[in-house]
């Protein structure tokens, strides 16, 4: 059985639809959870950290929401991808379906959830007194970069999981480290210069900071900033793609 262009496109759409529906199957609120989950977390963290970090910072709620929203998308997308290849083995070991489609569909379904949450984010931006500006269209760039970063990391993790199951426990711990290294609830100005430079080695922080610069400070990051984020995105895709390419023929033997 072979797949032409139309068949592959149809298959990918159906897989995305399956992954998107599966997440909210048999829930009362359905897709609304994409909006409710970050709101509940925002409320709790704003109450806890707003007192300590938000007193001398304007639009702290949006500052916090920017970090939470992008981190939650990153964490849910990459954690959920860990077992994607393993859990779909019963399909691609019997039907010649491109294995990478399962990771791509998972990442895209998570991206759709993120876009729903992003709509809620802009409602909060308006409520906080920040008016819409043309600069906001610049957010398309970090949004797409984060999607591709998540995709690259997801391909890497899902492939490694087949051969090294301990990654299922290690990655959530690393995500916790990444959370603290992404300046979600604290102002980076309290950090020494060397720590600020180290933060810029974290692509997630770069995306979060991009959102904050555009929305809160009404400025678009420099060309060098954009190129650095682009380089990190390409690096993540290359690592994921190369790992998958090296291991893909061995995957059916280990599932």
Predicted regions and their residues:
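Hydrophobic transmembrane alpha-helices and immediately adjacent juxtamembrane helices
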Residues: 1-255
């Amino acid at each position: 059985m072979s797949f032409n262009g139309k068949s592959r496109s149809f298959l990918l759409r159906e897989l995305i639809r399956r992954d998107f529906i599966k997440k909210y199957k048999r829930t009362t609120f359905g897709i609304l959870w994409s909006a409710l989950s970050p709101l509940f977390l925002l409320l709790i963290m704003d109450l806890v950290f707003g007192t300590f970090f938000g007193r001398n910072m304007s639009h702290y709620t949006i500052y916090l929401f920017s970090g939470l929203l992008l981190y939650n998308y990153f964490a849910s997308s990459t954690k959920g991808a860990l077992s994607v290849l393993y859990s779909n083995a019963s399909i691609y070991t019997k039907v010649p379906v491109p294995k990478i489609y399962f990771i791509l569909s998972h990442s895209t379904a998570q991206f759709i959830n993120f876009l729903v949450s992003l709509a809620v984010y802009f409602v909060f931006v308006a409520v906080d007194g920040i008016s819409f500006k043309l600069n906001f269209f610049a957010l398309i760039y970090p949004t797409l970069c984060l999607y591709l970063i998540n995709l690259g990391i997801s391909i890497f993790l899902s492939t490694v999981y087949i051969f090294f199951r301990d990654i299922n426990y290690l990655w959530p711990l690393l995500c916790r480290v990444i959370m603290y290294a992404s300046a979600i609830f604290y102002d980076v100005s309290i950090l020494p210069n060397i720590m600020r430079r180290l933060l810029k080695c974290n692509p997630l922080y770069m995306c979060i900071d991009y959102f904050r610069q555009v929305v809160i400070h009404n400025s678009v990051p420099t060309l060098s900033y954009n190129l650095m984020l682009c380089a990190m995105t390409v690096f993540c895709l290359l690592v994921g793609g190369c790992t998958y390419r090296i291991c893909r023929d061995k995957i059916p033997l280990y599932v």
